[in-house]
């Protein structure tokens, strides 16, 4: 049994149930001004007042000024002494950890060292991995025992049985997936250039004007200057024959044209040579046939063997549309100094569809020219007879 000793110098303990009320301590004397404190000499008789803060060290780099401090000076009070070394059972105990939990040198981020965020993310990843493994282990259950014979292990299936077609047949699928072969996208992407005078379209194809559904008359630009109406008819016959052979399988309307006009330069034409203005007009019976000519010849070049020209064909919509409007316009036009009807606009009735391709120029009864032709006047050379002084 432990014996507790009492302190004989302790104050008596009051056992009364009544509360004891003691008089409050007297208030401290009012503070004395500094000038009065030093003038009366109280600083010499009594201890100087305590300094309002603790001074543990001083790093004064300025000179000392005596007029700023009283002659008696202030009492320098040092801070509390550092705690001594703690001993536990005669052995030096470890120092307590800092309040923040980690030493300052461990809170510093070194170059290349992981940050606090990296450490947290790695810990979360490890925890998630452990949870996933545990879930996989919990989800696995042994196969239930059946009353039938034990199942036998068979060899793995060969690679041929893993083919998509074989898998589809085993599953009873009616449609087997097969990679589609690259196909051409309709007639817009499948031009059929005529090999008579032109080559295949250049790559990339020049910008093409989109023809409207009502456009049947087109303007063929950048034609060789030596090309005549007969050459243009031969080119169109070959194109229509190719288009009709392709369209005959699908029941589409036939490609036919009923008017051709190659604008000639009458000042440069004579019996030895002919020269055009570089463009021609063609009217088709349907707008689809006009678009077919544009798809086939737009962006093509002329063959060097036929015409020594490097022009690129450009096909656009004409300003005047329709056969009737063209006949009225060309019928009122006068063509001065035109040597032959070959240079006039030609109207075909019935329309040409390429069935006579390769037969040469069309027969005269099938061609009707429109326009007023004025032949050139004969030139008479006047000679002067006599002596010239």
Swiss-Prot record:
SUPFAM superfamilies: RNA-binding domain, RBD
Cellular compartments per GO CC: ribonucleoprotein complex
Residue stretches of biased makeup (Basic residues): 170-184
Record keywords, A-Z: RNA-binding
Keyword RNA-binding applies: yes
Xref: InterPro entries: Mei2-like_Rrm_C, Nucleotide-bd_a/b_plait_sf, RBD_domain_sf, RRM_dom
Name under which the protein is recorded: Protein MEI2-like 7
Provenance organism: Oryza sativa subsp. japonica
Gene name in the database record: OML7
């Amino acid at each position: 049994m432990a014996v507790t000793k009492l302190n004989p110098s302790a104050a008596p303990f009051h056992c009364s149930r009544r509360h004891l009320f003691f008089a409050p301590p007297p208030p401290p004397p009012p503070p004395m001004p500094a000038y009065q404190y030093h003038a009366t000499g109280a600083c010499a008789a009594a201890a100087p007042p305590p300094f309002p803060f603790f001074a543990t060290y001083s790093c004064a780099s300025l000179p000392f000024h005596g007029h700023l401090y009283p002659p008696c000076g202030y009492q320098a009070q040092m801070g509390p002494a550092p705690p001594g070394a703690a001993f536990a059972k005669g052995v030096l105990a470890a120092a307590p950890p800092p309040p923040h939990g980690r030493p300052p040198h461990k809170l510093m981020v070194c170059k290349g060292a992981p940050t606090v965020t990296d450490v947290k993310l790695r810990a979360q990843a490890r925890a998630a991995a452990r949870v996933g493994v545990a879930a996989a282990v919990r989800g696995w259950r042994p196969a239930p025992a059946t009353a039938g014979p034990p199942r036998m292990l068979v060899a793995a299936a060969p690679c041929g049985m893993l083919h998509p077609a074989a898998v589809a047949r085993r599953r009873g699928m009616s449609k087997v997936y097969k990679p589609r072969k690259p196909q051409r996208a309709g007639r817009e992407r499948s031009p059929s250039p005529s090999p008579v005078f032109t080559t295949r379209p250049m790559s990339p194809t020049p910008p093409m004007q989109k023809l409207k559904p009502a456009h049947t008359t087109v303007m063929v630009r950048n034609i060789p200057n030596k090309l005549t109406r007969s050459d243009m008819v031969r080119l169109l016959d070959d194109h229509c024959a190719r288009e009709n052979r392709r369209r005959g399988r699908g029941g589409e309307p036939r490609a036919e044209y009923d008017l051709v006009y190659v604008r000639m330069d009458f000042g440069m034409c004579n019996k030895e040579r002919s020269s055009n203005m570089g463009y021609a007009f063609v009217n088709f019976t349907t707008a689809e046939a006009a678009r077919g000519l544009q798809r086939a010849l737009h962006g093509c070049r002329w063959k060097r063997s036929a015409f020594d020209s490097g022009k690129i064909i450009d096909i656009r919509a004409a300003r005047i549309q329709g056969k009737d409007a063209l006949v009225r316009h060309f019928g009122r036009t006068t063509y001065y100094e035109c040597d032959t009807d070959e240079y006039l606009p030609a109207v075909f009735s019935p329309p040409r569809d390429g069935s006579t391709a390769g037969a040469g120029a069309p027969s005269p009864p099938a061609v009707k020219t429109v326009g007023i032709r004025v032949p050139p006047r004969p030139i008479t050379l006047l000679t002067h007879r006599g002596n010239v002084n």
